[in-house]
């Protein structure tokens, strides 16, 4: 029996990062965490491209376009959808989640999910480098491992 598992080595890999400008304070912290994880794992800055989109709803389209170019070994999606007083949160959170999953399946390239869906701004801050770690870091680690796993399968 052979077991395949992704390694946490980013050297020589190319990454696209799609980050939402809405809730920019959170998005920038997630981006910082992702960049830190990539660089600590051996990624070179020249092999990382960042795409800033207006809001979370726009993330799946740009992620799919980036993944479909053939230039990236993985794409990392980052942003924050924070619940408000209307059902808008539910629509956006659901569509972003489904859209990112669909984009990865369609493109055949790992697309990691680092979009926070929280009830409060405080919860988002906790997940963007405070009490609960940095989900941008986690999304980058998942992207690195998946890129390496997919390469092993080729």
Curated annotation (Swiss-Prot):
GO BP annotations, alphabetical order: riboflavin biosynthetic process
What domain of life is recorded for the organism? Bacteria
One Gene Ontology molecular-function label: 6,7-dimethyl-8-ribityllumazine synthase activity
Catalytic residues per the record? Answer: 88 (proton donor)
**Record keywords, A-Z:** Riboflavin biosynthesis, Transferase
Q: Which amino acids does the record list as binding 5-amino-6-(D-ribitylamino)uracil?
A: 22, 56-58, 80-82, 113
Give the CDD domains listed for this entry. Answer: Lumazine_synthase-I
Q: Where does (2S)-2-hydroxy-3-oxobutyl phosphate bind?
A: 85-86, 127
Described purpose of this protein according to its UniProt entry: Catalyzes the formation of 6,7-dimethyl-8-ribityllumazine by condensation of 5-amino-6-(D-ribitylamino)uracil with 3,4-dihydroxy-2-butanone 4-phosphate. This is the penultimate step in the biosynthesis of riboflavin.
**Similarity annotation:** Belongs to the DMRL synthase family.
Question: What name does this protein carry?
Answer: 6,7-dimethyl-8-ribityllumazine synthase
User: Which gene carries the instructions for this protein?
Assistant: ribH
